[in-house]
A protein has these predicted regions:
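Tandem CBS (Bateman) regulatory domains
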Residues: 30-80, 92-93, 117-169, 190-200
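Helix-loop-beta junctions that constitute the ligand-sensing/allosteric loops
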Residues: 1-20, 24, 76-80, 86-108, ...
Length: 200
């Protein structure tokens, strides 16, 4: 629980573990915390696991369209979505400039069609020849071509926190998009899940 509270207290994704001599002997990641939580799912409070997404106290909320002729962004304080016709580089720029780990890609009706994440950034940064593609391809083309694209990235308001945990674990992702009537209405992050758990 100390590690969870430390990760939640700031914008941390990893916590170093040091020995008595002050040397780093291990690094705990958010993904590892999700794995441990999932492995102990049978020991979690069933009341917590049955909480529905709509009843969470900590969820990023509904989108409002922001006028931006270049990107056709949809944004509120916690969620930014990019239209599939925007160039892929714009999604990458948003991830970097807003310090989020992923942005959903949506069609003109705000229906989610995929996601660009920091996982894509790491892959592109290790292959310089791919950078040019980001300026040529649209977001829609990029996510269709990418072998890093995760398909199961959404939940409904009636899904339970057990389902949320299972999807985080199965897909090794840190964010799920809440969908209602085929459009994004919010997001749940790993940090939201841990905050809910610690406050129960």
């Amino acid at each position: 629980m100390i590690v969870a509270k430390t990760l939640l207290s700031g914008d941390y994704r990893r916590i170093p573990v040091v020995n008595n001599e002050g040397k780093v002997v291990h690094v705990i990641t958010i993904t590892q915390m999700v794995e441990e939580l999932y492995k102990g799912i049978s020991e979690l409070d069933p009341t917590f696991l049955q909480v529905q997404v709509k009843d969470m106290k900590h969820m990023l909320s509904i989108l409002e369209k922001v006028k931006d002729s270049k990107l056709d962004l949809f944004q509120d304080t916690g969620i930014i979505a990019v239209n599939q016709i925007a160039k892929a580089i714009e999604a990458f720029r948003l991830i970097i400039s807003t310090h989020v780990s992923a942005v959903p890609i949506v069609d003109s009706c705000q229906k989610i069609i995929g996601c660009v994440s920091s996982r894509h950034i790491r892959a592109i940064s290790s292959n310089a020849s791919q950078v040019k593609v980001l300026y040529d391809e649209t977001c829609g083309e990029f996510i269709k071509r990418s072998d890093l694209t995760v398909e199961d990235i959404s939940i409904s308001k009636t899904d339970t926190l057990k389902t949320v945990l299972e999807k985080f674990y199965a897909n090794k992702i840190h964010r799920l998009w809440v969908i209602e009537n085929k459009t994004i209405v919010g997001a749940v992050t790993v940090k939201n899940l841990f905050t809910e758990m610690l406050e129960m």
